[in-house]
Amino acid sequence: MEPRPEFTVIAGPNGAGKSRLCPFYIRTASFDGDKLMLQLRKDHPEWPDRWISGSVVSELEKQKTKALTEKKDFAFETNFSSDMAVRMVHDFKESGFKTSLYYFGLSSEEDSVSRVIHRMQTGGHDVTDEVIRFNFREGLRNIQQNLRLFENITFIDGNSDYGHIVALHIEKGHIHEVEDNPPQWFVDQFENLFKELNTQSV
């Protein structure tokens, strides 16, 4: 039997290191909407924001449909702050894909804002404070509410230079591990939910 194709979500707040660190964890090239948006703004400075946003969504849907049709691995980088991101997980799961989550965590909205400011000062792309805070709150809420959709889950400390793994859950391998002294963001945001995953898989 051929292995199931895999849908991977690389999630976390702005500034958590998703783009920088995810290549160390997954082999599949990920769809990065922020990167495409920046390129479109550079190529088409005359376009209004709604055209650019629409083009990004259109390209994502195109690549998603291709992956579903061809049963090919697909990876998606996101703040997970939109209903569209949640629907994508359902769509791939219902099509028989293995679902995996790599979540890069930060402690607070302020931490996310400060890291984006630092990134911008070193040549990275900017995001408004309002968007950063929305993405932090809604992305966290959506992940917490939909954690059970994922068969494999890896929590990574966004404050670490090299993507330190905090917790790991692999459903079929019966692996459920948390490091001895996890960062406070994991304790506050996910510790109890993560324990429930282990109870359900027993």
Model regions and ranges:
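Glycine-rich phosphate-binding loop used to anchor ATP phosphates in small-molecule kinases
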Residues: 52-106, 139
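NTP-dependent small-molecule kinase module
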Residues: 147-202
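Phosphate-binding P-loop
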Residues: 1-4, 67-68
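The conserved Walker
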Residues: 13-14
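Conserved lysine of the Walker
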Residues: 18
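Conserved substrate/cofactor phosphate-moiety recognition/catalytic segment
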Residues: 22-72
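Short hydrophobic/aromatic beta-strand immediately N-terminal to the Walker A/P-loop
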Residues: 7-9
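A glycine- and Lys/Arg-enriched "phosphate-lid" helix/loop adjacent to the NTP-binding pocket
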Residues: 97-145
